[in-house]
Curated annotation (Swiss-Prot):
Region feature (Disordered): 1-27
Annotated localization: Cytoplasm; Membrane; Nucleus, Nucleolus
InterPro entries named in the record: Ribosomal_eS8, Ribosomal_eS8_CS, Ribosomal_Se8/biogenesis_NSA2
Family named by the database record: Belongs to the eukaryotic ribosomal protein eS8 family.
GO molecular function, one term: structural constituent of ribosome
Function: Component of the small ribosomal subunit. The ribosome is a large ribonucleoprotein complex responsible for the synthesis of proteins in the cell. Part of the small subunit (SSU) processome, first precursor of the small eukaryotic ribosomal subunit. During the assembly of the SSU processome in the nucleolus, many ribosome biogenesis factors, an RNA chaperone and ribosomal proteins associate with the nascent pre-rRNA and work in concert to generate RNA folding, modifications, rearrangements and cleavage as well as targeted degradation of pre-ribosomal RNA by the RNA exosome.
Biased composition range(s): Basic residues: 8-26
Name of the protein in question: Small ribosomal subunit protein eS8
Highest taxon of source: Eukaryota
Membrane topology of this protein: Lipid-anchor
Organism: Danio rerio (Zebrafish)
Regions that span the bilayer: none
Keywords linked to the UniProt accession: Cytoplasm, Lipoprotein, Membrane, Nucleus, Ribonucleoprotein, Ribosomal protein
Complexes and interactors: Component of the small ribosomal subunit. Identified in a IGF2BP1-dependent mRNP granule complex containing untranslated mRNAs. Part of the small subunit (SSU) processome, composed of more than 70 proteins and the RNA chaperone small nucleolar RNA (snoRNA) U3.
Length: 208
């Protein structure tokens, strides 16, 4: 028996049975869930109604995540699934679905922030810098360029919660694309009230 998205197999509201009037139709078909996992990219192409294509991601390990307040979007590695409002089973099996909360690698965002503001981010006090990082952060600049960075630094403040995550090297992000439909796991970095909300939820789950 195929997966069917009809409603004539259900009983009537009165509890009586319905006699099937026709066989299952092609337009009523359903397909098994993608259950996208974290791993080297594996995507299947599916031919769907109208000759269109869907991209069923079976495994993904990177995605495009946008840091909204800084208008910075970077491709970064997905590390882990930490929360899912709809189903804890999907967290246990590390399944990537829309609106699940994941941990992503913070390195691309830190590199962008340091080159944009020429300020260190997510570094422990007195940590050694590599020659390249030294070049970016403590470079001799002309007065004109220095003025530009000074102006930028007025808006360089980020929230303590985000700073804490940068120290750990991982950011909480939310997936906003549908991996089983478009074959991508793209989303946004959690900030502000939304970040506080999910941190509370994750903490409550750990406490159980």
């Amino acid at each position: 028996m195929g997966i069917s998205r009809d409603n004539w197999h259900k009983r009537r509201r009165t509890g009586g049975k319905r006699k099937p009037v026709h066989k299952k139709r092609k337009y009523e078909l359903g397909r098994p869930a993608a259950n996208t996992k974290i791993g080297p990219r594996r995507i299947h192409t599916i031919r769907v109604r109208g000759g269109n294509k869907k991209y069923r991601a079976l495994r993904l390990d990177v995605g495009n995540f946008s840091w909204g307040s800084e208008c910075c979007t970077r491709k970064t590695r997905i590390i882990d699934v930490v929360y899912n409002a709809s189903n804890n089973e999907l967290v246990r099996t590390k399944t990537l679905v829309k609106n699940c909360v994941v941990l992503v690698d913070s390195t691309p965002y830190r590199q962008w922030y340091e080159s944009h503001y020429a300020l260190p981010l997510g570094r422990k006090k007195g940590a050694k810098l590599t020659p390249e990082e030294e070049e970016i952060l403590n470079k001799k600049r002309s007065k004109k360029v220095q003025k530009k960075f000074t102006l930028r630094r007025k808006t360089a403040k980020i929230s303590p919660l985000l700073e804490e995550q940068f120290l750990q090297g991982k950011l909480l992000a939310c997936i906003s694309s549908r991996p089983g439909q478009c074959g991508r796991a793209d989303g946004y970095v959690l900030e502000g009230k939304e970040l506080e909300f999910y941190l509370r939820k994750i903490k409550a789950k750990k406490g159980k």
